[in-house]
């Protein structure tokens, strides 16, 4: 019983550490070679958690999903071309209540035109027990 409680408490704790892609907006169109900022946000929670790293990937959905969509593409299995992989050390947003970090990345030259899944894989250690949590969040963007 107690164990179950601890597990569910950890699960909600883990959910509270979840990141969001603040920018770019879903549906944004980029040209191959174009630079853009991926703004990775998380709430400034009082519960202890230690962010470790993120990986940002871009996966073409062309031929894997109905045209113009990424429906059914599972980015927990692959994030595609890795645009960034390294430490995640978010800072308090000026004038805001959340933590953020901007990553400047570029669409690879010659990237397949069409819908693409932009993913952020986020690795964090949650709570006093340092429970390792890996989450992958994704949005659909377009490459022209
Ligand atoms: C995505 O893939 C993972 C790992 O294979 C699997 O656990 C999960 O159920 C899949 N999700 C969907 C929506 O298919
Ligand atoms: C981070 O990126 C967002 C979205 O592009 C932008 O509004 C903000 O000014 C950037 N912040 C910094 C400090 O570069």
Q: Over which residues does each language-model region extend?
A:
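A cross-taxa feature marking solvent-exposed loop/turn segments within ectodomains of secreted
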Residues: 17, 47-49, 111-113
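Short structured motifs
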Residues: 21-26, 85-90, 102-106, 137
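Interdomain boundary/hinge segments at the C-termini of tandem beta-sandwich modules
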Residues: 141-143
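Internal, hydrophobic beta-strand segments that form the core of beta-sheet-rich folds
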Residues: 99-139
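N-terminal edge beta-strand
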Residues: 15-41
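Fungal secretory targeting signals
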Residues: 1-20
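Contiguous segments within soluble domain cores/interaction surfaces
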Residues: 35, 43-92, 121-122, 133-134
């Amino acid at each position: 019983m107690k164990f179950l409680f601890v597990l569910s408490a950890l699960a909600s704790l883990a959910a509270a550490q979840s990141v969001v892609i603040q920018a770019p907006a879903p549906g944004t169109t980029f040209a191959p070679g174009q630079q853009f900022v991926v703004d990775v946000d998380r709430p400034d929670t009082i519960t202890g958690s230690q962010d470790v790293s993120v990986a940002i990937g871009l996966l073409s959905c062309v031929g894997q999903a109905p045209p113009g969509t990424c429906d059914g593409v599972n980015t927990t299995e692959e994030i595609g071309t890795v645009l960034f992989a390294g430490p995640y050390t978010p800072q308090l947003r000026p004038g805001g209540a959340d933590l953020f970090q901007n990553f400047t990345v570029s669409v690879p030259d010659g990237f397949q035109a069409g819908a693409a899944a932009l993913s952020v894989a986020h690795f964090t250690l949650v709570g006093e027990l340092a429970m390792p949590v890996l989450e992958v969040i994704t949005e659909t963007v377009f490459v022209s």
